[in-house]
């Protein structure tokens, strides 16, 4: 990876310090005190040996085991000082590794027990005494393509907290100043005090003061941004939307090639070219609140963020395009690093505020202006909608529990919008447990009350129809009963599959096979009648059907004639006693 010549400072290595940053999240992960060789010496040696063969060039940062950062020490203790990988503690990106079992040797001759890859880290040189707090010296305007990295825009000390930044707000007593202050977007929930900080941009015209965040860390690298980095290295976890409707962007061709180093910037005649990568601010000749309301009312329905060209410090300016917006209504987007970057990029939905809500709110989060849902949020919403539809379906099921099966299934089908995708369990209620297909002429087996389709039952009873066991509970099937309502419901809801199974069943030879049933006896003397049991309902294990099975109960009102029972009773004492009683009754009622 090509390193900039500015990495090497003119000061002595003793006075110089440096830091390494993660290539993905741009967070500081180590300092020069944690390495066996000072960072600057390695950078100088690397610049001198760029023409040397790659095998003889060191591509690792060799770390001193006695002065490791805290996060690396924790990883070593967790791995018990054996072998492992070094990942960024902030974003989890791969940075290097360690090996104390068989310590390898680097091409430079040093032991690579604990090392970081140079291709996965970014070096940043800083002044002594400011390892974690380098001053922000080079911050070019996003509209200036080149030549701004060597301009000193702001010189100021670092703040006391790491994640502390200040947002420049327009403070004026006129109408535009108050409206600008009301429309200022807050990234944090609390206001921060301005201590020993200067504004990054000062406008000579009091009516035009653009919003520019001023970071306290100032960790702006003096070289070109990493090829995989996406934004300026600032400790800000949000994005700012700068509304050009407050500044009336004009199309004057006046150019402002360079920025002043120390003095305030006069933006009265500034008109940077507005292209795919940047937009410019310009002082408006006048301000009309009605025009602002009109501009807000015709805001585009959907916008699409387009990443722009990176500047020397990694500050990106993106122009947000729309089908209904012109060049004067393009908002200025500062792409700052945040964990929620996908909220603005990975979604196609957007919510807009009304004009009154937009003007009334003095501070509101970014999501209310340009709120887009990522994949995880959309999945949660879909799950919530499915649960709500399921609850409504269950309520309807309890409400229509007294109607017939066909009507009940019709009501439940109306409550379901997506039959097979949203509620696959409803189709499972119409599937046979043997063939895993929809029911075709379903039969209920007695005494286990399990339901199977006709082709499956005939196939099971092909060899032994008199003692066919149930495929689920292995109970001998004595009788089967056709379920007419279930058959009609299946035919109504799954017509194509039902007809397909019917055609295949009629063409096959299984239609001639018998159904499972035990040997039948005949009633002797008509039997003794008993009182019918009340109507009961049963929940079947493989489906959600509740059916009356009064007529499916054991019809044992008569005496079943069986030769085995006759033989047993002949050789029993009960038969003899019964015969004696019968003779006595005949003698008593029919005397001779």
From Swiss-Prot:
**Pfam families assigned to the protein according to its UniProt record, in alphabetical order:** RNF180_C, zf-C3HC4_3
Key word Chloroplast present: no
Q: Which residues lie on this side of the membrane: Cytoplasmic?
A: 1-564
* PROSITE patterns linked: ZF_RING_1, ZF_RING_2
Q: Which reaction does it catalyse?
A: S-ubiquitinyl-[E2 ubiquitin-conjugating enzyme]-L-cysteine + [acceptor protein]-L-lysine = [E2 ubiquitin-conjugating enzyme]-L-cysteine + N(6)-ubiquitinyl-[acceptor protein]-L-lysine
Chain segments annotated as transmembrane? 565-585
The keyword Membrane is assigned to this record? yes
One GO cellular component term of this record is: nuclear envelope
EC number(s) per entry: 2.3.2.27
Q: Which residue stretches belong to region Interaction with ZIC2?
A: 282-489
* GO molecular function (one): zinc ion binding
What is one process in the GO biological process aspect for this record?
A: positive regulation of proteasomal ubiquitin-dependent protein catabolic process
Instruction: Specify the domain of life of the species encoding this protein.
Output: Eukaryota
Q: Where do the zinc-finger regions (RING-type) map?
A: 432-474
Mark the residues carrying the PTM Phosphoserine.
231
Q: Which residue spans adopt a coiled-coil conformation according to this UniProt entry?
A: none
**Subcellular localization:** Endoplasmic reticulum membrane; Nucleus envelope
Please list the tissues where expression of this protein has been recorded: brain, kidney, testis and uterus. membrane protein. Nucleus envelope.
Q: What does this protein do?
A: E3 ubiquitin-protein ligase which promotes polyubiquitination and degradation by the proteasome pathway of ZIC2.
Record's subunit section: Interacts with ZIC2.
What protein name is recorded for this chain?
Answer: E3 ubiquitin-protein ligase RNF180
Name of encoding gene = Rnf180
